[in-house]
């Protein structure tokens, strides 16, 4: 695996692959990798001739400077994991390389509506930062395919919408959430959990499963089911921010005829803010 740190070196590495007509897949990350990231690499490996991974802790998507400063930087271990998973090229730029005019002056990309609620309401500006950096990474690498995880479901839809609206031409694929044996969604932020909080954390996924089970049994009072899930999360010692049942295709509120839904939730577990989601297919009525 080759590692490059500048846009010029990235372009030089990509050029012969493009001239040879090879398909290129992109896996963007912020590092501090876990098994979920490596699942994205495996999918990319199956979809393309060459796999490019990026590691960039994007300052535009952090709400608080202290969170940006505290985010783990584990480049050496991450590079070894990516090489072992079959990545051909790692792009690990400094902030100045991605935002040469500085983060304050950069042109920003916004997906209105979809980026304003749920995670967007609790983390103002977060999705503008995500869309901006992904748009720049797409422009710098010009991949045929990019792979993202479904754990960040709202982010996935925002990236797909941006890609379509701006005619970027990238095939955006997704991989299911990878979980610990007790159901906790794998996340770089799980490292913030102490032993007691780690023991409580699976309650978030358990509440989503309970809500999904109620839907599959035919219950349809969505607000009451959401409140029951919030109460279950609180009873486990977590602090829920939201539990919301949405239409899977666009995160609109579901109507009577909608069957492909997703439950989205966020909760604080000690110092860690956890997010999770669970797709649900309602049985046909009648």
UniProtKB/Swiss-Prot annotation:
CC annotations in GO: cytosol
Catalytic residues (UniProt): 37 (proton donor)
Protein localization: Cytoplasm
InterPro entries: Cyt_trans-like (IPR004821), Pantoate_ligase (IPR003721), Pantoate_ligase_C (IPR042176), Rossmann-like_a/b/a_fold (IPR014729)
Enzyme Commission number: 6.3.2.1
Entry binding sites for beta-alanine: 61
Gene Ontology terms describing biological process: pantothenate biosynthetic process
Catalytic activity of the protein: (R)-pantoate + beta-alanine + ATP = (R)-pantothenate + AMP + diphosphate + H(+)
Binding site for (R)-pantoate: 61, 155
GO molecular function, one term: pantoate-beta-alanine ligase activity
Gene3D superfamilies (alphabetical): HUPs, Pantoate-beta-alanine ligase, C-terminal domain
Keywords per UniProt: ATP-binding, Cytoplasm, Ligase, Nucleotide-binding, Pantothenate biosynthesis
Binding residues annotated for ATP, in chain numbering: 30-37, 149-152, 178, 186-189
A Pfam short name: Pantoate_ligase
Pathway given in the UniProt record: Cofactor biosynthesis; (R)-pantothenate biosynthesis; (R)-pantothenate from (R)-pantoate and beta-alanine: step 1/1
The organism's place on the tree of life at top rank: Bacteria
Family: Belongs to the pantothenate synthetase family.
Purpose: Catalyzes the condensation of pantoate with beta-alanine in an ATP-dependent reaction via a pantoyl-adenylate intermediate.
Subunit details: Homodimer.
Extra remark: The reaction proceeds by a bi uni uni bi ping pong mechanism.
Record protein name field: Pantothenate synthetase
Species the sequence originates in: Thioalkalivibrio sulfidiphilus (strain HL-EbGR7)
Gene: panC
